[in-house]
Curated annotation (Swiss-Prot):
E.C. code: 2.1.3.15
Region described as Acetyl-coenzyme A carboxylase carboxyl transferase subunit beta: spans on this chain: 1-275
Organism lineage: Bacteria, Bacillati, Bacillota, Clostridia, Lachnospirales
Catalytic activity: N(6)-carboxybiotinyl-L-lysyl-[protein] + acetyl-CoA = N(6)-biotinyl-L-lysyl-[protein] + malonyl-CoA
Uppermost EC category: transferase
Protein name (Swiss-Prot/TrEMBL): Acetyl-coenzyme A carboxylase carboxyl transferase subunits beta/alpha
Organism: Agathobacter rectalis (strain ATCC 33656 / DSM 3377 / JCM 17463 / KCTC 5835 / VPI 0990) (Eubacterium rectale)
Reported cofactor(s): Zn(2+)
C4-type zinc finger span: 50-72
Amino acid sequence: MMKLFKKKDKNIEAEETLAKNAESEKTAADGKNAGVAQETKEDAPETIVCPKCGKTVLKSVVKQHKYVCYECNYYFRVRAKNRIRMVSDKEAFEPWFTELTTGNPLNFPEYEEKIAKTQEKTGLSEGIVIGKTKIYGEETVLGVIDSRFMMGSMGHVVGEKITSAFERATEERLPVILFCCSGGARMQEGIISLMQMAKTSAAAKRHSEAGLLYVPVLTDPTTGGVTASFAMLGDIILAEPKALIGFAGPRVIEQTIGQKLPEGFQRAEFQLEHGFVDMIVEREDLKKTLYKILRAHRPTTGYANFDPLHSDDNYEPTELMKEREAKAKPFKVWDKVSAARQIKRLASVDYMDYIFDEFMELHGDRYFRDDPAIVGGIAYLDGQPVTVIGVHKGKDLEDCAKRNYGMPSPEGYRKALRLMKQAEKFNRPIITFVNTSGAYPGMEAEENGQGEAIARNLYEMSGIKVPILCLMIGEGGSGGALALSVGNEVWMMENATYSILSPEGFASILWKDGKRAKEAAEVMKITAHDLKELDVVDDIIPEFGGADEDALSSIGNYMKGNMKKFLEKESKLTKDQLLEERYKRFRKF
């Protein structure tokens, strides 16, 4: 599978060099001071006890590890100022809304005294610090909830700061990143606290409708009214490992309905599996990950903003591949059916890994589950951000079982649609790689609305206002394949197939004899050349003797060169013309 970062960005390299130099100078100075210092009890290293493993650990070393226990990998909660320092460029943070003060809307007894004591103890005026900063040079609004302040609960001031931040970010055309760490609503402010959920959500909505990026980072714990409002409304949702994330906390569930919760319930990994989180990110990778996300969402015009360094790239096949292609015998129809089904055939992720500079996988349908049969996320095509979605059958038996042999569930189609709508919002072209025997026909899929999910994709894809390119790279099985193939252009690999259903199913339905599958394949017109004649596909991708590892570079280069030509062509069209082109493409049938 592709790695998140294939090559280091120059902004990251420069920032890390400065940080290393500063650390080296500090270490050298510490060494000189150590030579003359008298060892006293006060000089003894400060230690803390890890609440998970129970071991006594050096506080200075824990700090070096981004406040992660070096014995058991436990994530300590991080103060707002430290969190800001960990992800911001040096001296880049500019605080906003520091003048807001906490009131007592319900005249709750001793609330003002509790606030005053908490302010004195923490040095914070309220439970969130928010402002503008830079991350490797990328400007963004950054907010951090500090759990030391009344468990990071959301009262009027926290809600007001978040709402005002979204409003100002909308005015200044800035993305928003919020680190969430909260027990939920602030009980002492009652119904006024509850209203913050609606207020912050409405502000997030306006920010989104302005076409701007919002990234919440869910840390331990994120619960209650914070989870049920702004924390779960991001374009891309990140989480730290093992973070508790849920609406009703474990104690509330157990005390209210008496249900004992299983191990790992409501943790970040649980939320990823159930489709509510895009990525779980190690703390040491957070700054780089946030930068990569911000960079991918820089405002752009057109769809062919390629790096000039690649303008002279040669996408022609090697002489060896040309020779191999010339020697290859043409496949008969059934040979193509068999070839398309081979487990060793190049998969979506192989092409994605070869063609794109970087790939950042995003997960989840935001409703029920993440479907491993569909892999999707943000990639770069020679510097041009694109949304890439592929059906992945798997590379071995274990992987195939995990990915349900490339038969997507409703959750997979909904994940794909979520990513496509996200691409539309941020003006990213969409490229899909299709290789499926069909949508999963199981009972659970029917219970979760398989037909509706496919129909919804067909409906929505017809109106998405960015270019869509679809590549049929193996099996194209019925509506399950079509649900990812409503594009401005559809390309098909030389030995791929695309059909109303499998030849076996066709023979069984029409002739009541599944053994006549080979005969059925001949009459169904399922090959690339048949479908090119029928105008179902626009281009045939050569396989240079077979879609195997040896041919990957030649096939990948062919795809890449023609993808760039496609995007250059589509960049000349208005959004209305894009939609009309796609509508006419399918209207002609």
